[in-house]
């Protein structure tokens, strides 16, 4: 129940903080820039994917027992810490993320990559991508008859209300604190479950 309460609280704060987006006269494109630096010479070997539930993960974790990346990754795009990437064909199910767990990595050329400009706190944008408003705006901008995709221009046209950097940081830190609390509770629950299994095992030895 405690974990669920934290998650409900986090979702409620996100919706409250970003509920004024319909009044915005700015757009995401005013605050981000696209990146497309390639992995020339195949220097970076850390191949990443974007999961709709886990964010950036190593491709080997997402596709166990399968080699998905090409032997030649020179055309793969480089992502650095706090960069964002999304799969144009899967953003409608949440496949968009900010890189936080690695300093650098590479992603398939199909991904669209971008980063926040100096006047936008990356965490503020990151949490906006979890809001109902963002997913509503995505649906209006999907293109394609067979497989609907969101282009970078489509992303840039989405309204975004951006307060001062100080307020952005306050919102980001507030939500990050809740995320950390949820993680700690999940970790504690995992330890309790291990302890339970151990005790049950000892009972039947």
Question: At which residue positions do the language-model features occur?
Answer:
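Short amphipathic coiled-coil heptad-repeat segments
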Residues: 1-24, 187-205
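Non-catalytic DNA-recognition/assembly elements of restriction-modification systems
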Residues: 4-41, 157, 161, 165-166
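Glutamine-centric residue-chemistry signal
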Residues: 11, 59, 135, 147-148, ...
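Amphipathic alpha-helical segments that mediate coupling or scaffolding at interfaces
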Residues: 16-17, 31, 128, 141, ...
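DNA target-recognition domains and sequence-specific DNA-contacting regions of bacterial/archaeal
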Residues: 29-162
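Extended amphipathic alpha-helical segments enriched in small hydrophobics
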Residues: 164-189
């Amino acid at each position: 129940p405690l974990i669920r309460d934290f998650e409900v609280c986090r979702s409620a704060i996100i919706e409250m903080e970003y509920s004024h987006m319909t009044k915005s006269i700015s757009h995401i494109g005013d605050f981000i820039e696209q990146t497309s630096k390639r992995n020339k010479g195949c220097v970076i070997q850390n191949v990443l994917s974007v999961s709709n539930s886990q964010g950036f993960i190593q491709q080997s974790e997402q596709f166990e027992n399968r080699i998905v990346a090409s032997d030649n990754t020179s055309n793969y795009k480089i992502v650095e810490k706090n960069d964002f990437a999304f799969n144009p064909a899967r953003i409608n199910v949440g496949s968009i993320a900010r890189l936080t767990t690695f300093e650098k990595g590479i992603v398939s050329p199909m991904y669209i990559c971008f980063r926040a400009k100096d006047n936008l706190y990356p965490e503020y944008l990151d949490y906006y991508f979890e809001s109902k408003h963002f997913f509503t705006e995505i649906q209006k901008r999907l293109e394609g008859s067979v497989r609907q995709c969101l282009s970078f221009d489509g992303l840039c046209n989405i309204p975004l209300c951006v307060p001062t950097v100080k307020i952005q940081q306050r919102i980001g830190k507030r939500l990050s604190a809740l995320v950390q609390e949820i993680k700690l509770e999940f970790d504690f629950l995992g330890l309790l479950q291990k302890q339970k299994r151990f005790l049950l095992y000892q009972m039947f030895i």
